[in-house]
């Protein structure tokens, strides 16, 4: 007789979960941040709010963002005036858009990741789909399974309404799936479209305006599995450990609420302070087993919630400016794409490391950290090990 323990042992993979491919995608419509305030106040019929527009201009100027990509074009917004109001019933119109577009953009990113992976898509055993943009049944995971032509027996997990920390969450889940299911190949997709959060300006709610200055659309996909097949699968990063925590005294710091008017976004002023005050504790807990205490010896992938968060983290940990280069680059080129951001940064890091001829995928360094921050305040901390280039 075979024992349960023997069955269990046979089910487990040998090595750590490994990122084997990364793909990214954005909608074609690109928005220039320097001219965005003019466009935004015009399309929302708010040009008479001159003081508010000046404030928004300053927000955009300070955002460290050059451009963003958005599914919402001028034509779409003109057809949906309620989406342009600050608080008008518009959920149906928004849902009609994202239910179709979120899986579609996810497919674009997933197709690129699968191509780089180089294996037939029939070998994908699990799908993790994550979006903060709308909800539906059957979910975006089901729609993507159909769009890609994955096997009907693929094991799906749908994550809705997580927020900006979820790029870390999906890596944590993919790690557990890959390491506990021998031969598993997990397709992870984060797809975000701001059609749920876009709204006109309000004098009384400047936090909503902050979101309008920062958020952009994008999708990222990765393939994760343990024990890469030599000569066939190319490892990029190993997922060594993953943790999640709720920061103390942070209730209500970042909230989102799905209402008739779409997804409303609420932000307290001291989010950068709350994150920077608590980040060292998360780092110590994550890196104590590795005896690492020099944060400049790591490569860094941090969710770029906004420039103030990055500045304060840099200051608190005395990080050298180049540590957050990849993070700031993605913020500058795409804005805050919620859960997809950290996967875009992983992609940027391995590409720039290869381009510069560095010895590892992690800017020539062995160990790295990936941080996700979002509603809660929830923090995801993932310890990464790079791979020789």
Curated annotation (Swiss-Prot):
One of its GO terms (biological process) is polyketide biosynthetic process. It comes from the Eukaryota. The active site is at 164. Pathway: Secondary metabolite biosynthesis; flavonoid biosynthesis. It catalyses: (E)-4-coumaroyl-CoA + 3 malonyl-CoA + 3 H(+) = 2',4,4',6'-tetrahydroxychalcone + 3 CO2 + 4 CoA. The keyword Iron does not apply. Its EC number is 2.3.1.74. Keywords: Acyltransferase, Flavonoid biosynthesis, Transferase. GO terms for molecular function: naringenin-chalcone synthase activity. InterPro entries: Chalcone/stilbene_synt_C, Chalcone/stilbene_synt_N, Chalcone/stilbene_synthase_AS, Polyketide_synthase_type-III, Thiolase-like. It is an enzyme of class 2 (transferase). The keyword Magnesium does not apply. The primary product of this enzyme is 4,2',4',6'-tetrahydroxychalcone (also termed naringenin-chalcone or chalcone) which can under specific conditions spontaneously isomerize into naringenin. Belongs to the thiolase-like superfamily. Chalcone/stilbene synthases family. This is Chalcone synthase 2.
């Amino acid at each position: 007789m075979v024992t349960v323990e023997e069955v269990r042992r046979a089910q487990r993979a040998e090595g750590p979960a490994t990122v084997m491919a990364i793909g990214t995608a954005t909608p074609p419509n690109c928005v220039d941040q320097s001219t965005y305030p003019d466009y935004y106040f015009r399309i929302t019929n708010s040009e008479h709010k001159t003081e508010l527009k000046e404030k928004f201009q300053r927000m955009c100027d300070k955002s460290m963002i050059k451009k963003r990509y958005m599914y919402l074009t001028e034509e779409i917004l003109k057809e949906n005036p309620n989406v342009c109001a600050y608080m008008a019933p518009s959920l149906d119109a928004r849902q009609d858009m994202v239910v179709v577009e979120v899986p579609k953009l996810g497919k674009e990113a997933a197709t690129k990741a699968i191509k780089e992976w180089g294996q037939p898509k029939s070998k994908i055993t699990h799908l993790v789909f994550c979006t903060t943009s709308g909800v539906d049944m059957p979910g975006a995971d089901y729609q993507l399974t159909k769009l890609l032509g994955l096997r009907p027996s693929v094991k799906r997990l749908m994550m809705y309404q997580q927020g900006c920390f979820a790029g870390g969450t999906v890596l944590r889940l993919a790690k557990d799936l890959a390491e506990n299911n021998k031969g598993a190949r997990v397709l992870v997709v984060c797809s975000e479209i701001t059609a749920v959060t876009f709204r006109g300006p309000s004098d009384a709610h400047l936090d909503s305006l902050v979101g309008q200055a920062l958020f952009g659309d994008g999708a990222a996909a990765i393939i994760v599995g343990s024990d890469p097949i030599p000569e066939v699968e190319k490892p990029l990063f190993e997922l060594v450990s993953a943790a999640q925590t709720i920061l103390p005294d942070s209730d209500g710091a970042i909230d989102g609420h799905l209402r008739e008017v779409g997804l409303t976004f609420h932000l307290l002023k001291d989010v950068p302070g709350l994150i920077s005050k608590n980040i060292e504790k998360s780092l110590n807990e994550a890196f104590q087993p590795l005896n690492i205490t020099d944060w400049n010896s790591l490569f860094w992938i941090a969710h770029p919630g906004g420039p103030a968060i990055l500045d304060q983290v840099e200051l608190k940990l005395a990080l050298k400016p180049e540590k957050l280069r990849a993070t700031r680059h993605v913020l500058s080129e795409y804005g805050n794409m919620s859960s997809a951001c950290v996967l875009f940064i992983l992609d940027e890091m391995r590409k720039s490391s290869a381009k510069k001829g560095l010895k590892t995928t992690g800017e020539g360094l062995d160990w790295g950290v990936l941080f996700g921050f979002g509603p809660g305040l929830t923090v995801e901390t993932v310890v990464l090990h790079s791979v020789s280039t």
